[in-house]
Regions:
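Single conserved hydrophobic/aromatic residue that forms the stacking wall/gate
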Residues: 1-11
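Active-site loops and adjacent core secondary-structure elements that bind or stabilize anionic groups
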Residues: 9-10, 19-25, 30-34
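Catalytic cores of large soluble enzymes that bind and process phosphate-bearing ligands
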Residues: 12-18, 27, 45-52, 56, ...
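Short beta-strand scaffold segments in enzyme catalytic cores
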Residues: 34-41
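Glycine- and Gly-Pro-enriched alpha-helical subdomains that act as flexible
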Residues: 42-89
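C-terminal binding/interaction regions
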Residues: 89-132
């Protein structure tokens, strides 16, 4: 369970745990593929039901911006791992600073290295959520 924070793996210590937990809970109940963006304990963007994780991310970012939310310092949850670092890179370019995802990709190290180089936080929950 995501509420058991001691089971999460923190890649950096600069995360906003409350926003990450909220985003993960929302992602659990959202149609896959989904990306959830939270800030200050509120949902500010969601992308769901997309074929690709990048499409879900772009949908969530665009919705956030359309409704006037500032993404600087926001948190993001994904219902599945990132097979490449592309979503992490797009998130960073848009101001997102912390991410929670299940982990388990053969290329997790690419995302970890990008986060470390750019002072982002990333947590691995070890839990995949798929709702089709």
């Amino acid at each position: 369970r995501i509420a058991r924070r001691q089971r999460q793996m923190c890649i950096r210590d600069r995360n906003n745990t409350d926003d990450l937990v909220l985003a993960s809970i929302i992602a659990k109940h959202t149609k896959s593929n989904c990306i959830i963006i939270t800030k200050n304990q509120q949902l500010i963007g969601s992308g769901m039901g997309q074929v690709s994780r990048i499409d879900a991310l772009n949908q969530a970012i665009n919705k956030s911006k359309k409704f006037g939310f500032n993404l600087d310092g926001a948190s993001l949850a994904s219902d599945a791992f990132f097979p490449f670092s592309d979503c992490v890179e797009i998130s960073f370019k848009n101001g997102i600073k912390s991410i929670i995802q299940p982990g388990g990709s053969l290329r997790d190290i690419d995302s970890i290295e990008f986060c470390n180089q750019n002072k982002m936080s990333m947590m691995f929950s070890g839990i995949r959520h798929f709702k089709h």
